């Protein structure tokens, strides 16, 4: 957010607190003087509580901007400038003030809201009254040597905490006295840097309605600039002290009205700007964490600040109205000359913004709870060193702050001096030196992420994994380490119902519905405090209520840095008695049901020490080292709940004294939001009942007061129905995110010792028959006698954990349960994590032939171990034989719970488990047995056959897979609608029903079957022997065939060689006998070669021819011709 928008919000809040005195708690008109409520941005309202939507206020702002253009830079947020000037001692004039204002970071929304209370508390501080600037008071720095920090004694520190706590009650009286004193004094000449500003403002009129902010700047010898605010009367130009004294009572009522207006105005602005506050607070938390790590580097700087702190008041020529005196010294003739030896102006915290401080008080160490970067490293030692350093700073300031002679002047109306140690501590936490920002190493914990594209805003970094677009790159170890600490600091809040619903966790109280309920409850109590007697202040009491730091004591390892034998300053045994006076909380649900929460309600928080006007507004870091160690341990474990909650927090009797209102909380801090109150549950467990906190539930007692909110309440009570008066809607759970079938089959967490069940549909029908008058939900509910019941961690550790690494169960699609059984519905489970989990379990393959695990009903993971949910198993209808593991140990792969097939187990997608822990069916039956008044024991039924409880059903045709039997009505085709609605007794559900075969009942048939099996085995062995013999014969014949084939190949090769040789001989013969002609034949050639050779053969074989003298010469010639041919 820009500095302009931040400046606008800050100025409008401060001006709202300085409204007219007539706007008391009953008069709800516009706080802008002269505004009738018309022309507002929110046109549907006839009034408003904020100046943001007032057109008259905007018009006056524009007029003021024209007159203040010379000092526009100096008019950034007054509190921020005052805090920054108080923390950094490096400014020496108005130029430094302007540089500071430009360099102020707008990331710290939390300290800004906390500082606004201090601004509103400075109602008694100085304002220039006339243009001349004459002063009646001269502060003397040289005449009072006791104003140095070395003048304080150690005895002042013992009563300083109690004085601070009790002095906050009289801020209205201080404001009244400051208004009386304001008219009797004027301001002397200021330094030349601001004279022009004061003259311009005096020209515009000293009776400005919006309370201008002025800078009182010390001369060059004092390096401190303080911006203060002043209350101005709405009456034109007050002229005498008598006029102001006549309006003292009305002024005091006006201050109280403004305080109440500030609270409700802040609630409106929180609803409008929650997203911006979340972003700003995350940046602020990062700064605070890094600055506390660098506290040792700034120790020198803080010592210089403490030495220069008493010189905050301005130089010799600069005077103003002093308010360091106690309330008795404000009156009478001392108005014109208060004692000037008090030379330190500090910021006073007012009750007006006590709701912001009470939120940080609930978590006991809100400043330290932001340091989750060190939490992930487990750096407990560094936290304790930081806390010890703060304790030393507080002691050093308190021991050397003020002389004992001035302790007598400290009254209940002077929180100024005693708030100085808090100021010094605050300096070390909220210092905003721009040079420190460059030293930080702020980057996204996601590997490879540079901070761009985050959901949480445009700033280039973040310190949490929520909102990171590259969340799929995060290893499961880092994800689990970060997500486990990102929890809401409000005790009992799981992060649900927050305005920023895109994140399942948050680190601040803004947007938390439980914190909003506490704030509204506190406003009701303030109305009671206005009408009642103010509590007496005890300035001498050294016992003040510290914020309760609830730590798991048994889990804290013994550290050498703390003393286990030293008790804290305020014993926890007596804390309940002290809180007993202030713990009565009364709310009217009709006044805030739809405006605060919309359509969803969570249980309101228990009011503890923040409701007390005596509550100390800051954590005491210096009581002992043991509390420091407890605080550090609580910081490292943000999931710490109220383990040491006192059981009696109120003395008001309950409407139903026979029942104790219990809030059932498991170890994750999830409340039981069910509206169901069952008779049998009350009889079985008389000490347990559900805490009804739905504002949408109306009773006839308050129906006339809720006529204006009936429409939003009816839509909140049941989004599925527009009738809020239906009887069956009284007992429905608040969660309607699941359909009715899903809610019936949801694996519910159950335990006989402490029950936190959401009512099912079967419960609704039976409970709807109860008498309407027995259950009363009064409009004003007083939360008393709370007993927080935590479920056994040994049993719930396996039952209530999400398999996704780093998931605490919040934000699931399945509803408001603290856990779930599968990755489906988990917002943290993405494809990368599922693939990673599937890769680590490579043996998890679907037993269906040809199934690769895709298309399963149980999820999109790549494998499963059972046929249920497999689409291919249903199509084929085959019953697959058990795997090798099942054959080796069939008992190992079966769930001992009757009727359980291994689905939905926490241990994963396995088809079996060895115990009932993690079995959703066992949890469901345990709940049914508890509701029916009978106990459930799965071990006694380990060997029973699973059968369908529907009468006449043999298990066939079920919709939940290929199994023959089942133990629930879901998926049974023979179960009618009435049968589903009706309840079965525990005996009927758990009764053994064996269906034995007729074959197994006759021993003769068994023997006959065994004989047939033996005969078949013998015949099989004979056939196997014949088969072996045939196989041997076939192998020999194959060998002979191969030999014959080899011989044929050799013969073919020889034939080819002979053919080639014959061809050569024929060609040689043709060439030799080409010139020789036989009688009656043509010359030899390839065509007549065969005939020619036959003729020659006949001639040589025939002796007659051969001896014939005619043929003898021819034959000799032929011999000579063929003699050269070699064969």
Swiss-Prot record:
Stretches with biased composition (Basic and acidic residues): 61-71, 82-103, 244-259, 348-360, 726-735
Species in which this protein is naturally found: Mus musculus (Mouse)
Gene: Myt1
UniProt-listed InterPro entries: Myelin_TF, Znf_C2H2C, Znf_C2H2C_sf
Protein's recorded name: Myelin transcription factor 1
Family: Belongs to the MYT1 family.
One function term, GO molecular function aspect: cis-regulatory region sequence-specific DNA binding
Binding site for Zn(2+) 7: 948, 953, 966, 972
Residues engaged in binding Zn(2+) 6: 895, 900, 913, 919
UniProt-annotated binding residues for Zn(2+) 3: 488, 493, 506, 512
Positions with a binding annotation for Zn(2+) 5: 846, 851, 864, 870
Tissue and organ distribution: Isoform 1 is more predominant than isoform 2 at all stages of development and adulthood. Expressed in differentiated neurons especially at higher levels in newly generated ones.
GO biological process: cell differentiation; diaphragm development; endocrine pancreas development; intracellular glucose homeostasis; negative regulation of gene expression; nervous system development; positive regulation of gene expression; positive regulation of transcription by RNA polymerase II
